[in-house]
Amino acid sequence: VIEALGLDMNMKNNRTAYRLSPAYIHDNTIEWSYNMEKLHESLTACVMDNFDILDGYDPEIKFFLNGRAILTMECDDIPDLPAPPMPAPYKEVPGVLGELVGCVADEMKGLTVYPWGCGRFNDQKNIYPCAKDIMAISDSPTALGISASLGQGYKLVKDLDDRFPIAVRDLENSNVFLHMDEVDEYSHQKDPAKKVRVLEHIDRLMEKHFSDAERIVYFVDHGTSSITGEHLPIRVPFWTTFDTSIKNGEDVPLKRVIPRIMGNTWI
């Protein structure tokens, strides 16, 4: 649902949203595929060739990264299905969407788009006033969708380097949330060297564009292993370029991070 909002898709009238990720189905197992540079165009074409299976449900689909997509349609099926990134036992997808998944797998020798994270939109809770005046800049529908659901501004910028000058310009009018999803993506690809290179590149871009910025907060939103490709349940760091009441090494619950960083005058 969040991703559908970030991609400006129709979620009215209780439409259901489905995340679709490339995956191989074999030996009763779902194996997610993150290395789709050479196959994502043929996978996308195959999905669209069979898309008429969903006719009658007013389907809308948007692809965004290496064969991944968000699908919304008028359907009551909200199945509980396995989620990436780790392999999982195969679970049959119900209804016409299951027909689409099967047809694509048959034509692509086991490769298909498998749905997960299905749901409908609900009204969101109020956010801290200090967090309303923010423009989110990212290539991730997830990050953008969170901002959209909270009433914040958001811009989809696919190229990493392009996000930085856009962020500089937007800082003239609002605060900016600048998001780099590439670090997580390369971890799922199990490519440690590529992950290090992009971190070093981000560091150079920050120095180039924000060396004179006085108030920057760096967040690591979660851990992902570039060896196994799995998410890691670990304590994640954040760091500020300005003084706060937070002591070095102090654990701060997620719901208290913004108040503690911004201070009472910002709430």
Residues covered by each model-derived region:
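Feature captures the catalytic ectodomains and active-site-proximal regions of enzymes
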Residues: 1-267
